[in-house]
Amino acid sequence: RVRFDKKVLRDFYSDRGFVDFEVISTTAELSRDRGSYFMTFNIQEGEQYRFGKVSFSSAIIDLDPKSFKTLLKFKPGNIYSPRVVDNQVKKIENKVRELNLDFIAIIPQIARNEEDRTLNINFSFEKSPPNYVDRINIKGNRVTRDYVIRRQFKSVEGDPFNPSEIRNSAARIRALGIFGDVNVSTRASNKVSSVIVDVEVEEQPTGSFGIGFTYSNDEGPGGTIKLSERNFLGRGQFLSFDLTSLSDANQVHINFLEPQFLNRNLALGLKLGSKTTSEQFSKYDSEVTEFEPSLSFPLSQKSTLKLKYRFSDETLTSKSTALSSAILSQMGSKKINTLGYVYDLDSKIDTIDPNENLSMKFSQDYSVGDSNFSYIKTKGLFRSHKTVFREEVSISAKLAFGHLAQVEGKSRVVDRFKTYTRQMRGFKGAGIGPRDRHSTSQDPLGGQYFAVAQLESDFPLMVPEEYKVRGTIFLDAGSVWGLDDRGGTSGVNQPGGLVDDKFHLRSTVGAGLMWRTPIGPLRFDFTKAIKKLSYDKPESFNFSISSKF
């Protein structure tokens, strides 16, 4: 364990330019109650280095190394990181393979400049001895099928031996998360110019059972039960059962995922679920049963595309006489068929700076129901995250938006957009947007458009680090607007019957505390609405907790 901690420290500092970092000594002291140890690491950081000049050289005829310059993802002056260099070598090796060039090694040659504390990098293209993969041996997998491990290798018996590809395969095996330890090594074969790849794995428990407790202003108290298996029947498949019960909603889901459908880089997902709500935002109840198969595949190293179909049986009921007529007219059952896709991009897989990340999700659904009813629903989410000031301060930004385009019929309140407290802080759930102010219960109608931007920073407070308390400040701005039917309870043709569905910007500022406790993370937010309308539902305090055991 101490050796592992030393490695973590070394990786942490070297990834931030401290190439001379070393652990000078470690000491262990027994606590007063003799129940634990205090570990002290005496370290020496050394100087921080940055990237200097970058060059390419080649001893191979007919190979122009300068053509690979466009692949560079770092610039002189960036903080040096061996991880960035390794990622750069992988990119160049991938390009070499695309050109069908075998037995070429890319060697990063590093020259240190002590005066300005920079490291000059030369990527040297050299001819490597021709070797081939003789065979791949796998052992230690008592539960997991051989093919689950073997399909992580892009190289098969008889292919040219590529050390980088073998390292990448080992990383993919570890990323499965079903083995406690993975060791991949190579040795010479009896055959000329051939190597044997040995894979030794250590099985670990892959099933889990969890019970959780949650509380938020929106949903009140709630409980969750989750059972999951990440290596179902040793096939590398994922199976889970989730049950969630809240004060005004209950849902149950069964999920199945086959990550290599038909032995291809194609993930097959199956989801079966049911959700019921009881006067969640207005005085009506809903019941939805759905089945959703999907296929996902990578478009690049950083992005995936999911194609999905969903069948849902949806029922809306109400016993209230005070419900808005704009909602009351939508009571009944519908069977909905939906075709859609989800595009997902995450830059953390391939970024120069480990302290920043950009992700994006974009989806569209085309839904068709009975009785001339259909719509197209579009949603997008952009996230950006960065740590500054020696990684002690975190800054994040988020932009979420959506549009409901009704093709046939009138839009329903359950299909329109509403905001939740965690999405638009400073307002209650469905606290902004079009509202039937002429109904007794002041029912929120939702909107066919929504957009919310959030900017947040969290930082350490002047308390001991072991208390695990951080402060946060944030700014939220957004709106929900647009209806294809603005008729309220009084009727569209009567005075006061129209619903205001125009775009009105709302904004809030706030500060809060985040506390990681033994029972789970607690969050306290204090907010003030800067811009709001008279009929909005603001709130000045929000508390949430999530606990698993």
Predicted regions: what they are:
Residues 214-222, 241-252, 279-286, 333, ...:
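Solvent-exposed loop/turn segments connecting transmembrane beta-strands
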Residues 175, 190, 208, 216, ...:
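C-terminal outer-membrane beta-barrel translocator/porin domains of Gram-negative envelope proteins
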Residues 153, 186, 206-217, 223-246, ...:
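Transmembrane beta-strand segments that form the barrel wall of outer-membrane beta-barrel proteins
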Residues 179-180, 207-209, 220, 232-239, ...:
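Repeated loop/turn-to-beta-strand initiation elements of outer-membrane beta-barrel proteins
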